[in-house]
């Protein structure tokens, strides 16, 4: 449902222009004057700004929930030398670009809370247990005004962090690193909950509520025609049988309601909530999460299905599925023991049962974020286009559902999920 930023995919058939700022409107307030106090706080020997440049942090059409720019600053220091500093600035979308819908998701309040409170708490828990870990980039500035929330973070690319090409997905080595890091995040969130009580209400809420039923059922009905039309062109054996299994708009929404309901008698974690390849960066053996806007308390099956469905490369997505769960579980057990979890730790068998119980996350992800993950960068892609009624919206939806990369993924996923009883 949420289509977040997509990093360049270095794909030759993409229609991305060479100039990253060609379609970017940079808010006028992002300037030297805004950054000077930040630099004075962050850089002990700061004297002055010599050069200030703002460029797009993502390719055109690849960021649907925020304005995100890379700020490059050359500064003079007290000894007369110069330093080059880089930051990522994220701020709220304007209303006419989808900001009203985004505001309803509490994305920026969640991310503000994660950077200000939760991530520091988690790191402290591990440090008290004698282990230094890192989970996310350093956030150097947070500002909340009536107009919205702004976050300024270190630019991980300056530390040689990179995304993996989303069109290819994660290989086994990267999946292993991510699954272990997810387990570290989840374990700390459980201990934090055990010691400090419930998280803020926004981490228990979702857009799947009765107030939004008409919107979601309308969106589901609107995309159904193009989805089925594209499906019939896929190289999927017994395609008509799979079409019969597609949920109605009401069934789709009811499934979403059930997925977001939390059973507090079960093992729950604070999920990252948007765990796909562009929200994970790598540098050597270091792995960090970015984009903490969708955090949600609930079953770890949410993050696991979302990650595997959206981001494991095609050659291992289904083949290594059970292995992925085992890798995550092994590290989760290690971390929960390290952090002295007082309750029974879920067994591997119990985790697999959770994956089945919450298996609707698989098709929810496959029909949502995966569609966009495998789409080459497109300046015309936007949340408004996705939801637009009429011929233009219909054409766009058919285009994304008939994308050969999406077809290849779904031709694998449909039989896999059917055999698990998840359709």
Stretches with model-predicted labels:
Residues 1-67, 74-84, 196, 243-266, ...:
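Regulatory N- and C-terminal appendages and interdomain linkers associated
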Residues 110, 173, 177-180, 222, ...:
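Generic recognition of stable, solvent-exposed alpha-helical segments in well-folded globular domains
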Residues 55-225, 300-301, 338:
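Conserved ATP-binding subdomain of kinase catalytic cores across diverse folds
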Residues 162-171, 289-293, 306-313:
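Short helix/strand-bridging catalytic loops that position acidic/His residues to coordinate divalent metals
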Residues 67-78, 88, 248-300:
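Active-site acidic catalytic loop and adjacent metal/ATP-binding pocket
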Residues 7, 160-272, 385-423:
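ATP-dependent phospho-/nucleotidyl transfer catalytic cores
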Residues 113, 117, 294-338, 361-383, ...:
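Active-site activation/catalytic loop segments of kinase-like enzymes and analogous catalytic loops
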